[in-house]
Amino acid sequence: MAAKKAHGNFRLNSMSNRHRIGQIILHIVLILLAAYTLAPLLLLVFNSFKSNNEILNNPVALPSSFTTEYIQKAMVAIDFWRSLFVTFIVTFFSVLLLVVVSAFAAWGMTRAKTKLSGFMYLCFTAAMLIPFQSLMYPLVSLAEHMNMKSIPGLIIMYGGFGVSMSIFLYHGFFKGVPISLEESAMLDGANIFQMFFKVVMPLMKSTTVTVIVINAMWIWNDYLLPFLVIGNSDGTTTLTLELYFAKLKTGQYGNPWELIFPAVFITIIPIIVIYIFLQKWIINGVIEGAVKG
């Protein structure tokens, strides 16, 4: 009996040691992946406070002093506040359009339960597989013929391109919402809009935040569609376009890295801050949509 007990304790200790070693290896791998992911961002931050000579001599070193001189110069070079306002307007109204249209569309498809609604949902999800590059030239031609090469036209196009993914996320959530809640609201005298915004919408906060953040990050950082639609229009360029059109290109003595790094840094700060504060909602929204779908 004593021998069997000792053998059992040895097996438990052996399993515990293997588990501990496995956890250590897992943590090392995760730390390396985190370092690999954060390294470009840290380099961007450090080099935003360096002179051009410091960057060229040792781009991975800490700055000699954390001065905002180069950030201020970069803000002037890309006309930061004006382009920030334009980017905010485009992002805000594009996301608002996406949320309203995709929420209503996904809700209608889940409640109709017909072959047509199923086919429409299939078309929307299949549209996510179409690469944007295959639509560029027809899009530019259509925008020119319909006089949509403007900020409102850009907002409408973002609504069209982002609606497929948004419907996909909302559709999975709506399938798990009991229709009895909506029927009860209708019996209490609510019209379809009151029922949707006062009963259904409050139930999908996490999914809505997920749709907002995913689309806001994409629209905020997008360069190609604004370049094709509005180009270098005076007073209506977004931050990403300003990074290209501003005087940050190769000059007689090379690239002005002391302006390029801080310009990119201040451009991505707003969307990073939004993501940090809303990441919990994003994860919950994706999980809810997957489980209920």
Task: Give residue ranges: language-model regions.
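Short, Lys/Arg-rich, polar N-terminal cytosolic tail immediately upstream
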Residues: M1-N17
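A structural signal for multi-pass alpha-helical bundles of membrane permease subunits
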Residues: G8, R18, G22-G293
